[in-house]
Amino acid sequence: MRHYEIVLLVHPDQSDQVVGMVERYISQIKEADGQIHRLEDWGRRQLAYPINKIHKAHYILMNVECGQSTLDELEELFRYNDAIIRNLIIRREHAITEESLLAKSAEEKRARKAQREEAQQVAQEAE
């Protein structure tokens, strides 16, 4: 089995259905004895350029290990799912399990925000 990195851009109106879609794809991979090494939900983000007059999309990143037949099935599911406006599948040499830079920066941003809020609370209590 080979390792692949999959990025999906989901229509922003379908953001609430992303969890169900991802679960369906994960079950498809696991039924074929594949593995999910990394799954990240990047949320809604601005597109670099409009796609079909859409300016934002919900981003999903998956690193999977599966066979070619499973990958072909996934590609077909992506192609015929109207909610997915773009997909990218890249073959990787090995499994990537660490967080992506985008996920790390989001965590750092949340940590800074929490520190800032904590500092504000301490300052308010001191007054």
From Swiss-Prot:
A biological-process GO annotation: translation
Keyword Ribonucleoprotein: yes
A molecular function (GO) term: small ribosomal subunit rRNA binding
One Gene Ontology cellular component: cytosolic small ribosomal subunit
Entries under PROSITE patterns matching the protein: RIBOSOMAL_S6 (PS01048)
InterPro entries recorded: Ribosomal_bS6, Ribosomal_bS6_CS, Ribosomal_bS6_sf, Ribosomal_S6_plastid/chlpt, Transl_elong_EF1B/ribsomal_bS6
Keywords recorded for this protein, A-Z: Ribonucleoprotein, Ribosomal protein, RNA-binding, rRNA-binding
Domain of life: Bacteria
UniProt record similarity statement: Belongs to the bacterial ribosomal protein bS6 family.
Database matches in HAMAP family: Ribosomal_bS6
Function: Binds together with bS18 to 16S ribosomal RNA.
Name of protein: Small ribosomal subunit protein bS6
Organism: Acinetobacter baumannii (strain AB0057)
Encoding gene (name): rpsF
